[in-house]
Design a protein with these regions (language model features):
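A recurrent domain-boundary module in secreted/ectodomain proteins
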Residues: 491-527
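Surface-exposed, proline-enriched loop/turn segments that connect beta strands in immunoglobulin-like
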Residues: 530-534
């Protein structure tokens, strides 16, 4: 439901800006209201509020029957799936038993309840009541999963080990669902990546701004005794404070190395090296770095309906970086919404800069200082990524991924002859063959890239910016052939989702702070890059085109 809720969120924004009254051609016939279609999508995501097989929440029994609202957890689960026969003679549909903090979207739930155009698009009986309950339940989940440090822990499940087994003794629960450090995926764990934090909490910060600035509906959150705005503030204050303490503008003056288990099931420890912030930071005005990966320890308390400090639930930073520009931008987006909701104005930037440069820890800052520092940090992240990584295409970082050796080393393993087909014949692995849609042959032992030959890029469409004259694939293969790994392979990508998050963060800054200068000195740090350098322009006979800059000729 992540993408669906984002779409609903986008339509809600459009409606708030007064530009959402649009229609699109629809397969359901004629021009359809975008808001009505978003409401219809809300109807459909109600299935994400159910257990995979609609079994009762907390049943812990694989033989338990499903099929009633007892199987409704009101959270956004990991997926919905459906299918059936081509002739329509039968069909199936499932929900999911696992709920990740990353996939919750209280802003979308709030929009479906409170935006009249979106709400009118929902036709299912009880849809409004379901999303009212879902909004409250999602907020309770975030309160339950907030660590002692600030970041949000993994999630919960109604199906232990995917088999509805009994929960382990002492396992923390949330409305009879068991805590999971890494819901859905364990290899690698699903809640290491910092993107889970910044994407999820951006929605909370935007919702906080909406409720605070629009004199909007501010309902109670379950039995917590907190209004929605109060619950959001409790989460955001600690979360923002943690990022304020652990984001680097400049470069740390030293490093520290330690060992820890990356996954809960690891038998050996991994060595990590990260910046040592205790040795201070030297700000060169250009560099920046944010936490990139976390490991988790402990678990939350059992949820009893009211917020409790989770003193036994902690996280540790095991990676830093500046190359994940989508995450950097989403963090900036979050900080900007938080600052605006707290009442920080553009005119406060001088004080915000001073406050940030003189800060010690977030816990020592007043509410006003933390909000001002938030705006300053958000703006600095946007300015620095723009100045450091902008090129003639967009924003791109020279990246590195040692796992790319798996392109050639990971082999397809087909059945070894122990499986029978429908004709009751035992087939050897050599008999299991087929063809991919692109024509690649599927057979036992072929490499990952052999059935994805489009990666080989024989057309030269994807040239390497890091090794002139070679395609990205040929350059990677050359590095692999030379050393048996891709440790020396670097590549520059302009990822679509990075570009999307960058544009949305810049848009948020313009929406909330339209008078904010691009850089502190009011002058862009780079001239516009135009490629190619010679451009032919055709104008009508009645028009005269004249350059307005010296040195320009036509």
């Amino acid at each position: 439901p992540d993408a669906e809720d984002r779409a609903i969120q986008a339509v809600y924004d459009a409606n708030r800006w007064g530009v959402g009254d649009q229609t699109v051609d629809s397969k359901w016939g004629g021009g359809q209201s975008i808001s009505a279609l978003a409401g219809k999508m809300g109807d459909e995501t109600r299935n994400n509020m159910y257990d995979k097989y609609y079994k009762a929440i907390g049943c812990q029994d694989k033989w338990a029957k499903g099929g009633s609202d007892n199987g409704k957890h009101y959270l956004m689960n990991w997926y919905t799936s459906w299918g059936g026969a081509m002739d329509g003679s039968w069909a199936w549909q499932i929900g999911a038993s696992h709920c990740h903090e990353f996939y919750q979207n209280p802003l979308a739930a709030y929009a479906l309840v409170n935006d009249s155009a979106l709400n009118a698009g929902m036709k299912a009986q009880g849809a409004t009541e379901d999303f009212e309950a879902s909004l409250s339940r999602q907020m309770e989940l975030y309160l339950w999963l907030m660590s002692k440090d600030g970041p949000i822990a993994g999630g919960c499940t109604n199906s232990w080990n995917g088999r509805y087994e009994q929960y382990p003794s002492g396992q923390a629960t949330f409305y009879n669902m068991a805590y999971l450090e890494h819901p859905v995926y364990a290899d690698p764990g699903s809640n290491h990546w910092i993107g889970n934090q910044v994407w999820a909490v951006q929605r909370l910060a935007e919702l906080y701004y909406v409720v605070k600035s629009d004199n909007a509906n501010d309902p109670q959150v379950g039995k917590t005794g907190l209004k929605l705005s109060e619950a959001l503030e409790k989460i955001l204050d600690r979360w923002v404070g943690w990022f304020m303490d652990n984001t680097i503008l400049g470069k740390a003056n030293g490093e520290k190395t330690f060992s820890a288990k990356y996954e809960p099931y690891d038998t050996t420890e991994t060595e990590f090296t990260i910046p040592d912030l205790s040795k201070g930071i030297t700000d060169d005005g250009e560099s920046f770095s944010i936490p990139s990966s976390l490991i988790w320890s402990g678990q939350p308390n059992d949820w009893k309906g009211t917020y409790q400090d989770n003193n036994n639930l902690t996280c540790t930073i095991v990676g830093y970086g500046d190359g994940d520009l989508g995450c950097v931008s989403s963090l900036a987006n979050t900080l900007i919404y938080y600052a605006k909701a707290k009442g920080v104005a553009t005119s406060d930037m001088a004080a915000a800069k001073t406050s940030y440069e003189n800060k010690t820890t977030a816990s020592a800052a007043s509410a006003t200082e933390l909000a001002q520092q938030s705006l300053y940090l958000g703006k600095q992240l946007l300015d620095r990524e723009w100045n450091k990584y902008r090129d003639d295409i967009g924003l791109g970082v020279s990246d590195h991924n040692t796992n790319l050796k798996r392109l050639w080393e990971t082999k397809l393993a087909l059945p070894d002859g122990t499986r029978a087909n429908g004709e009751n014949k035992v087939l050897s692995a050599s008999r299991y063959t087929g063809t991919m849609p692109n024509g690649d042959t599927v057979k036992d032992g072929v490499a990952f890239v052999d059935i994805r030959s489009n990666y080989k890029d024989t057309t030269g469409e994807y040239m390497s910016k890091d090794a002139n004259g070679k395609t990205m694939y040929d350059y990677a293969k050359e590095c692999y052939d030379a050393k048996g790994n891709t440790d020396d392979y670097y590549f520059t990508l302009h990822r679509f989702w990075h570009a999307g998050d960058i544009m949305m963060a810049l848009g948020t800054m313009y929406e909330l702070y339209p008078d904010m200068s691009v850089n502190d000195d009011d002058t862009p740090s780079k001239d516009l890059v135009v490629t190619p350098s010679d451009i032919e322009i055709t104008v009508g006979e009645s028009e005269t085109l004249k350059p307005n800059q010296t040195g320009c000729t036509f």
